[in-house]
Amino acid sequence: MGIRMGRRLLLITLLLGALLCNNVAYAKFSRYSFPKDFIFGTGSAAYQYEGAYKEGGKGPSIWDTFTHIPGKILNNDTGDVANDFYHRYKEDVNLLKDMNMDAFRFSIAWTRILPNGSLSGGINREGVAFYNSLINDVIAKGMIPFVTIFHWDTPPGSGKQIRRLPERKHSNMHEKDYADFAEVCFHEFGDRVKYWTTFNEPFTYSAYGYGGGVFASGRCAPYVSKSCGAGDSSREPYLVTHHIHLSHAAVVHLYRTRYQPTQKGQIGMVVVTHWFVPYDDTAADRGAVQRSLDFMFGWFMDPLVHGDYPGTMRGWLGDRLPKFTPAQSAMVKGSYDFIGINYYTTYYAKSVPPPNSNELSYDVDSRANTTGFRNGKPIGPQFTPIFFNYPPGIREVLLYTKRRYNNPAIYITENGGNNSTVPEALRDGHRIEFHSKHLQFVNHAIRNGWGDGYLDRFGLIYVDRKTLTRYRKDSSYWIEDFLKKQY
């Protein structure tokens, strides 16, 4: 049986990011190699590209606060200006159309709509007007808007809730405020937006923001990092994720009951996963592969599909893993019309002994060590210190999802490889190879029954940080040629 499909989607995401070059000749491979109803597109996230962090009535988010702490971000970079999309979005939308894109995926900044984080603080009509103009421009250029409601930019006030966990049944994500924000989005934009995602990569938000402390909110246990002011890496990631599931399910219920019948849209969640292969061909390392998948992918997919967390997590975490009530389980189960999957890389997984019981954290709970190297050799070409080019992984993720999770409608919402040097940005043939090979393995998955969508995460466009001038890279011209329609 083939994977269940809605309208097919292939999103090739562009994070506006690095420079102009000549075309590179590759064997002919085009949109016509895919089903005719595939949609090809690009995308990014509000904090990463909008800028204008104090303009247009916008309030601060936890990322504004976090990046302004010296030393938290490499080179003390911030999103204060970013790519200045807020002022230059028409130019960028035109670039997307020039590349023959069919869709644009973007997120809505919570505090650009609700500057104080809650409905009681008032709706920022200037922010609503900005997104209305963006949506209208995307549609006017013949593209489809795909909108993410939450991409990590929580209002700072709601972050204080975590300090009272687990005594209070809240997380950093205040569920009512989030539901109010989502409803404003549905009400203001839902007549034109037909594809919604509630959360983008909640794994990253929970594990890195509350386990490792390297992302906002910057919380972790002192034995994980002395740079964290406070936190409990053994519990907070699981508590935050639990309330994300409840917030997601409540918003999906809201959309399905109040808006979907008339707006006729779809709604889902975007999750991220790596693929894993055994470090050694042993039963122990094959078990480490499954645990790695359960603790990253299953942490989100199992509740969405089955109504509870994976058995491995339940068995090993004990009371550190929150429990759903029967009513909550029923609400979370099936709370999606589609699943978005972000895939970047594959790692080896090796089984390791149980961790020190006095220094528990999300990072060690799976009892698996993951690495991109075996015997000193990388699993694939290394794009960044943590990302390796391993095209078969995208096929394996799709087919695993089909087998394990009852054949959901899937969109690959992010996939890609970054630059490490300026010359690579100027002549990015490696990215063309990345796209070409991953698309070939997507085709393999289609032949094995999958066929919903694909998206690339890293830059087809270079933005000069001093002048904010946009330059197209070789890969953008390859994509333009790949997507060219024959009339």
UniProtKB/Swiss-Prot annotation:
A beta-D-glucoside binds at residues 48, 151, 200-201, 344, 414, 458. It catalyses: Hydrolysis of terminal, non-reducing beta-D-glucosyl residues with release of beta-D-glucose. Keywords: Disulfide bond, Glycoprotein, Glycosidase, Hydrolase, Signal. Glycans are attached at residues 76, 116, 369, 418-419. Its EC number is 3.2.1.21. Disulfide bonds join 220-228. The active site is at 201 (proton donor), 414 (nucleophile). The keyword Signal applies. One of its GO terms (molecular function) is beta-galactosidase activity. Residues 1-27 form the signal peptide. It comes from the Eukaryota. SUPFAM superfamilies: (Trans)glycosidases. Pfam families: Glyco_hydro_1. GO terms for biological process: carbohydrate metabolic process. Belongs to the glycosyl hydrolase 1 family. PANTHER family: BETA-GLUCOSIDASE 29, GLYCOSYL HYDROLASE. This is Putative beta-glucosidase 35. It comes from Oryza sativa subsp. japonica (Rice). The gene is BGLU35.
